[in-house]
A protein has these predicted regions:
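A short loop-to-beta-strand structural motif that recurs across blades of beta-propeller domains
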Residues: 2, 46-48, 94-96, 141-143, ...
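Short loop/turn segments that connect beta-strands within beta-propeller blades
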Residues: 5-9, 51-55, 99-103, 146-150, ...
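Surface loop/turn motifs at the tips and blade-to-blade linkers of beta-strand repeat domains
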Residues: 14-18, 63-67, 110-114, 158-163, ...
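Extended catalytic-interface subdomain
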Residues: 34, 42-98
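Non-catalytic accessory segments flanking enzyme active sites
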Residues: 71-123, 169, 189, 196-273
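Generic long, charged, amphipathic alpha-helical segments
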Residues: 152-173
Length: 273
């Protein structure tokens, strides 16, 4: 990792070696957290806090994942109000958090690791929104909990588990939340407003396709960027206005003419045996 002053263009810190490349900044633009990767095992196992006023050799260790079956990452909430340390193994996860404007505080545990319990955390206002498989929810569900006491005994489901629908992802925005769902092999993007007045899927064309959310770092926006491709549509990047429900094509891959018209493609279902 390198630290660069964006105003002067000066690199103000020498490279920090053996990191995963991920980092999360506090709101003071002075402290950030980064992940140390063991150079032998390549396991992400430690989180350090850096202060740009001091050499990185003095960075304090804030978390050490000692269980060799787990790796870790550090991330920010979409609102930039919270910083998370995520511990995860094949079937189990665990998340800690602090407020971004309190970088020297101790990370608090949301829910201690329990074998088989997987969860990921988003934040909106004074609640965490958690995609999880609690109570044998193998397709996952979404729960809500107050930040003041976020242990799973207080989780309240806001999107129930469904046996035929897999919840894959959750994106949080100021006015909307977007759920990536998969049903019968096809992905759908569900858009819901926080006030409950809107609940709809982004419209798509075609019998078979692939749709996915792209990088959407902005919290205060009504625009969702996503990718789409199908047998009839080349790989495309689109921007969807969640208020007006209009699509705007930003980029599309050029495809050479193969003398096959789009109407010549169709989906055929086959029963597995």
């Amino acid at each position: 990792l390198y630290v660069k002053d964006l105003i002067t263009g000066e690199v103000i810190d020498t490279k920090i070696k053996n990191t995963s490349g991920g980092s999360a900044w506090s709101t003071n633009s002075k402290n950030f957290f980064y992940v140390y990767k063991n150079p032998t095992t390549l396991r992400s196992e430690k989180i350090f806090r850096h202060d740009t006023d001091f050499p990185h050799s003095e960075d304090p260790l804030v978390f050490h994942e000692k269980d060799e079956t787990f790796s870790i990452s550090v991330s920010e909430s979409k609102s930039l109000e919270y910083i998370f340390i995520n511990s995860y193994s094949t079937l189990t996860s665990e998340v800690r958090f602090i407020k971004s404007d309190e970088p020297l505080s101790e990370f608090q545990l949301i829910q201690k690791r329990t074998t088989g319990l997987e969860y990921s955390v988003n934040q909106f206002e004074d609640h965490f929104y958690i995609v999880n498989n609690k109570d044998n929810s193998f397709n996952c569900k979404i729960s809500k909990v107050s930040i003041t006491d976020p242990s799973y005994k207080n989780w309240v489901d806001i999107m129930e588990h469904r046996e035929s629908v897999l919840i894959e992802d959750l994106n949080i925005f100021k006015d909307y939340w977007v759920v990536t769902e998969r049903e019968q092999g096809l992905t759908k993007l569900r858009v819901q407003s926080w006030d409950g007045s809107e609940n709809y899927f982004i419209p798509v064309e075609g019998e078979t396709y692939d749709i996915y959310t792209g990088l959407n770092p902005s919290f205060n926006t009504i625009k969702l960027r996503y990718g789409f491709t199908s047998l009839k549509t080349p790989s495309s990047v689109l921007e969807f206005d969640m208020l007006d429900q209009n699509n705007k094509l930003l980029k599309q891959t050029d495809v050479l003419d193969n003398n096959l018209g789009r109407e010549q493609y169709s989906e055929i279902g086959v029963v597995a045996v």
